[in-house]
Amino acid sequence: MSLDISQFPVLAQANTPNELRQLPQALLPQVADELREFLLKSVGMSSGHFASGLGTVELTVALHYVYNTPFDRLIWDVGHQAYPHKILTGRRDKMHTIRQKNGLHPFPWREESEYDTFSVGHSGTSISAALAMAVAAEKEQAGRKVVAVIGDGAMTGGMVFEAMNHAGDLHNDMLVVLNDNEMSISENVGALNNHLAQLMSGRFYTTLREGGKKVLKGMPVIKEMAKRTEEHLKGMVVPGTLFEELGFNYIGPIDGHDVDALVETMRNMRNLKGPQVLHIMTKKGRGYEPAEKDPIGWHAVPKFDPTQFKKPSTTPGLPTFSQVFGKWLCDIAEQDDKVLGITPAMREGSGMVEFSQRFPKQYFDAAIAEQHAVTLGAGFACEGYKPVVAIYSTFLQRGYDQLIHDVALQRLPVLFAIDRGGIVGADGPTHQGAFDLSFMRCIPNMVIMAPSDENECRQMLYTGYCYNAGPSAVRYPRGSATGATQVEAMTALPIGKGVIKRVGKRIALLNFGTTLASALTAADNLDATVVDMRFVKPLDAELVTEMAQTHDILVTVEENAIMGGAGSGVLELLQKLKMPKPVLQIGLPDEFIKHGSPEEVTHDLQLDAEGILAQINAYLAQ
């Protein structure tokens, strides 16, 4: 159910950016207030990303007010902060459907709206895309402006600086808005700084600056003195030296919650030549006290009542696989101070909060820099340490070359704890862990494990810790564990060996990972054999051979892309052994998996017990 827009009288007049631009500037503060209230109530009704959007309300209003979107290109980095953008671009009546099956996409998405000029979900991509659009705009001579909005967290990624270095060299007209919500230099935010930012972005100052360069071109000593004078003036209020060195003109920082200051500064900057950076200071969770105090805890929320000023209480349930990993990491660190935990800015999501607090000297947050995180682990392994890189499946894609070149090629014993393997649900195609088994399986020297439950996960992590002949990976899903009895004692599993879980006839299900329970349920209806394969690489060739010799049909089950996945490994083995055998591969299809709840997505892809049974029966009927 959508909100009653009559409760928001000014926002009701701005369903599109064009309507927003018809309003007098004096009404923009009220637009921002109503937009924030709408967002608060909307996310409370539907669930979704929360704190980031509250922090970008004034910025979003100012951008769409000053720039002629969608003709002017606006690119959001990652997209957590883009809910206000969706509300102002004709989608407010559908906001209650966001992240839900057949509802609005969780991030800016080109197929959804012409205002979403670039589909996003991973951090650090916006400036590269914006640069390309700026170059295209110059080629077309259409007068189009280009703006990228990026957070301070994403600025830690190497791709960002690669793009800025290139943009500084090409010198096309573009604006990068640095949304800094860490408040690291908050003492510089205020009336004086806003005034100086507007002054430095104004036509008089920039004309004087460019004219001065021409006049002083042949007078290097005076030119250097003038440059230092300007740097001294700017240095009083801006930390922009790095951006200037990359070839950007830097303005700021200014208060990102002062919509009038944002509008005036952006108007001044809109027609500046060359690449520009506008540094704004914002606060995540702005306008909602609990989110301001705990922006990480309120990053994404379930449905809640905003008037209660707290998230709904949840009854303690089964531990998540992330928590199982976190406990194992603490347990092993108690025994071995050579164990090092590495995460690319996913401490909370990966279950490493307790580890970071109890073992701070063994904990390394590499920031949003997956390539660096992987090679950091490689370097530690070279020095005799036991690095454990905790990383989401979808983000390991970003460190693939490092996994091959820096880890596997050197046979370094780095353990990868791969979270969010398989279907993740509401975050959609940018975050589904669909490809890791496929892209790791082809790498020489890798050992890849897929636990069927939390106890097996714990033992596999220990197996990877004990394995010193090369890199290893334990791949587990998002969400709650299965309820298996936890065995505190840690025992290394024999490498490349599976176990038979059910003995049946004719059909053998070779299961990889936490789909085991569904495979067993389906097998009960078929009187089929079920094998918990455990290892994707190396495969248990002896067990696969036995199943092929004693059964008419093999069925592989995995929550990974069928193409190149564990099932493909079984087929390759059978072909190598010259054992022709019908094999049905059950897994993720050759398409990007859309958003929805994990249960909905699993059902639609026929990966639950009912779906597995249906796929097998359909195969038998052919």
UniProtKB/Swiss-Prot annotation:
Pfam families found in the cross-reference section: DXP_synthase_N (PF13292), Transket_pyr (PF02779), Transketolase_C (PF02780)
Reactions mediated catalytically: D-glyceraldehyde 3-phosphate + pyruvate + H(+) = 1-deoxy-D-xylulose 5-phosphate + CO2
UniProt cofactor note: Binds 1 Mg(2+) ion per subunit. Binds 1 thiamine pyrophosphate per subunit.
Magnesium recorded as keyword: yes
GO MF annotations, alphabetized: 1-deoxy-D-xylulose-5-phosphate synthase activity; magnesium ion binding; thiamine pyrophosphate binding
PROSITE patterns the UniProt entry points to: TRANSKETOLASE_1, TRANSKETOLASE_2
E.C. number: 2.2.1.7
Biological process according to GO: 1-deoxy-D-xylulose 5-phosphate biosynthetic process; isopentenyl diphosphate biosynthetic process, methylerythritol 4-phosphate pathway; terpenoid biosynthetic process; thiamine biosynthetic process
Entry cofactors: Mg(2+); thiamine diphosphate
Record note on quaternary structure: Homodimer.
Name of the molecule in the record: 1-deoxy-D-xylulose-5-phosphate synthase
Organism: Shewanella sp. (strain W3-18-1)
